[in-house]
Regions:
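Dynamic helix-loop-helix/coil hinge segments at AAA+ ATPase domain boundaries and subdomain interfaces
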Residues: 122-151, 377-379
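Short acidic, hydrophobic short linear motifs in intrinsically disordered regions
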Residues: 32-44
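Conserved ASCE/P-loop NTPase catalytic core
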Residues: 138-312
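A short helix-turn-beta junction within AAA+ P-loop NTPase domains corresponding to the substrate/partner-engaging
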Residues: 284, 325-341
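C-terminal engagement/docking regions of AAA+ P-loop ATPases
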Residues: 406-436
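Conserved AAA+ ATPase small/helical "lid" subdomain
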Residues: 351-414
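Short, amphipathic alpha-helical interaction segments positioned at domain boundaries
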Residues: 13, 77-131, 418-429
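Short amphipathic alpha-helical interaction segments
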Residues: 45-61
């Protein structure tokens, strides 16, 4: 798979990366591995052998590298002779690699992509409006019970890739909505393992957020084809995670969360529960959301870079909006979506689905018993049926009997989920934000 935004390199000059950085990466990789075939060097550095050959020849002339005969790896069969050779560093080469590691970056991995080339790549992957339809969105949402006007607003936000503020009581599907949005983000994207700005390296790929896409990978092995990322940051989010993180020991940077979310979705979950006050967190995003660019500092050199801010930002909270945000915040959110409690009818449909999913015979009378005898004025939640049926099945397994819906089993499951001793902790429609 050839990327359309940047060309796979054929010569060293095509990398647009400093020659001494590539030389250092090559020598340190070989010193760390003792010996590698030409094909293995291609794999480790993500580069065609032809791009490395000028540096290898230079290292051989200066006696920093030696050859150890032909490799017997199956992958080298039929390849040119230099690719089939095994390479190692000499004692002088090992000393030179150690000197490089002591003063230069210690990054090891595929060769970084030039930052300007990366900008072309990411911009090519976020163009125009997203192709999201009502039927496709409903299919992605699956069995999640939402009113049509809520679905319409989610669709509008996705088509425009606009900022989104989702609020509502816990347990009604806010997190599920953001997860399902990923299914409609569009075709997979290509991202580099790392990028370089001069002699500074920033690691971009993160296996936590970047899921390898199915199918053929790019010819350019500096890149990886991944599903569009959904980066979720919860109550643990700190402002430092939105800046480049410099590893002083290994002398390279880790990309911040919003960079890793580029061309995807960045979700601020549990908004209002972070240590940083909500308005201060919002202020960090005002310029990026409005200008579509973010400014980041390379702390080791003092340089500043301008990064395209091409992720869709979603703020999600189960705290009371009236006590959490102000008019200025809401003005900057393109879409404000309240996810309410399910109606009794929707609650019944969810209960039926959970019974089918968990292998319990459904009884229509169970809905009336739950609503009239157990819930009373207690607010319904979309997550309750799953928990109730799971507890019912647990207790049936404990008694070694088949699970069934009855007043007794429903009452036991209800008490397990909502022990009366918890009082208002299980009844408050809205939680209050922490005081920062």
């Amino acid at each position: 798979m050839q990327t359309g935004a940047i060309d796979a390199p054929k010569r060293l000059e095509d990398l647009h990366v400093r020659r001494d950085l590539v030389a250092s990466l090559l020598l340190r990789t070989l010193a760390f591995s003792d010996q590698l075939s030409g094909a293995a060097l291609e794999t480790r550095l993500g580069l065609p052998f032809e791009t490395l050959l000028p540096i290898i020849e230079e290292f051989q002339k200066t006696q920093l590298m030696d050859t150890l005969g032909f490799s017997n790896e199956p992958a080298v069969e039929g390849r040119p002779i230099p690719v089939r050779m095994n390479y190692t560093v000499s004692s002088a080469g090992r000393q030179r690699a150690a000197e490089m590691s002591s003063v230069q970056t210690r990054y090891l991995g595929p060769c970084p992509v030039n930052f300007e080339d990366y900008l072309s790549l990411v911009r090519s992957q976020v163009t125009g409006k997203a192709n999201v339809t009502d039927s496709a969105l409903k299919k992605a949402l699956g069995t999640l019970e939402l009113e049509q006007h809520v679905i319409d607003q989610i669709g509008g936000a996705m088509v425009s890739r606009a900022s989104l503020f989702i609020f509502g009581a816990p347990g009604n599907g806010k997190s599920t909505i953001t997860e399902r949005m990923a299914l409609l983000m569009g075709a997979p994207i290509e991202i580099p393992h790392a990028v370089s700005i001069g002699d500074e390296i920033i690691r971009v790929i993160d296996p936590v957020y970047h899921k390898i896409a199915e199918g053929e990978q790019p010819i350019d092995r500096r890149l990886v084809k991944v599903e569009r990322p959904v980066v979720v940051a919860g109550g643990e989010l700190k402002l430092q995670q939105l800046d480049l993180t410099y590893d002083a020991s290994n002398r390279y940077y880790e990309a911040p969360l919003q960079w890793k979310a580029n061309a995807g979705v960045f979700v601020i979950d549990d908004f209002g529960r972070q240590e940083v006050p909500p308005m201060r967190l919002l202020n960090r995003f005002i310029v990026p959301m409005e200008k579509k660019v973010d400014y980041l500092d390379l702390s080791a050199s003092g340089r500043k870079i301008e990064l395209p801010f091409l992720c869709q930002v979603v703020f999600s909270t189960n705290l009371s909006p009236t006590e959490l945000v102000d008019e200025a915040f809401l003005r900057r959110m393109a879409y404000k979506i309240g996810v309410g409690n399910p109606s009794p009818e929707a609650f019944g449909r969810i209960l039926r689905y959970e019974c089918d999913r968990q292998g319990v015979a459904f009884d229509e009378k169970a809905i009336g018993y739950l609503l009239n005898n157990l819930y009373g004025k207690k607010p319904l939640r979309g997550s309750h049926p799953r928990a109730l049926i799971a507890r019912l099945v647990d207790l049936a397994n404990y008694r070694q009997e088949p699970p069934k819906l009855s007043p007794q089993t429903l009452k036991e499951a209800f008490d397990a989920c909502f022990n009366p001793a918890l009082g208002s902790l299980t009844e408050d429609d809205w939680a209050r934000p922490a005081i920062n």
